[in-house]
Regions:
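Beta-loop-alpha module in the N-terminal Rossmann-like domain of NAD(P)-dependent dehydrogenases
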Residues: 50-110
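Residue-level detector of intrinsically disordered, flexible termini
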Residues: 7, 109-113
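Intrinsic low-complexity, intrinsically disordered segments enriched in polar/basic residues
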Residues: 1-2, 64, 113
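N-terminal Rossmann-like dinucleotide-binding module
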Residues: 1-48
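Short helix-capping segments at alpha-helix termini
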Residues: 27-28, 87, 112-114
Length: 114
C-alpha cells in the first residue's frame, strides 16, 4: 500500500480549482486526475500536470484514485455520488449534497448501506 493518497476532483470551477490546488500542496496527497469538460478547466488540469478524464465513469474505470471530490453543480451530485458509492470509491460531495431532502436521503442511505 502506498503512503500517497490519490484524490481526483470532478469539476474545475471555482471550488474545484481550490480543492485541486490544495491537494497539490498537501504532503502525502497526489491529485490523481480531474474530470472537466470546459477548455479552461482542461487547461488548468494540464497546468497542474494531471490527467483529464472526459467523464466520471472514465475516471472510475481507470481505478487510479483512492477518493473523489465532487465539485460539480448540485443537480449532478446524486447521480455522481451514487456512481462513486457503487464503485466503492470514497467521495466528498460539495454542499449542498442534493437539490431536495429526498435526494439527500437517497445518497446518505446508499452510503450507509455500502
Amino acid at each position: 500500500m502506498s503512503d500517497i493518497t490519490r484524490i481526483a476532483v470532478v469539476g474545475l470551477g471555482l471550488i474545484g480549482k481550490r480543492h485541486a490546488n490544495i491537494l497539490c500542496r498537501t504532503p502525502g496527497v497526489e491529485l490523481s486526475g480531474v474530470v472537466e469538460q470546459s477548455e479552461g478547466g482542461q487547461q488548468e488540469a494540464r497546468r497542474l500536470g494531471v490527467p483529464v478524464f472526459a467523464s466520471l465513469d472514465e475516471l472510475l474505470s481507470n481505478g487510479g484514485s483512492d477518493g473523489i471530490i465532487l465539485a460539480t453543480p448540485t443537480p449532478l451530485h446524486v447521480d455522481q455520488g451514487l456512481a462513486c458509492i457503487a464503485h466503492e470509491c470514497p467521495v466528498l460531495i460539495e454542499k449542498p449534497i442534493a437539490v431536495t431532502a429526498g435526494e439527500a436521503k437517497l445518497l446518505t442511505d446508499a452510503a450507509a448501506a455500502a
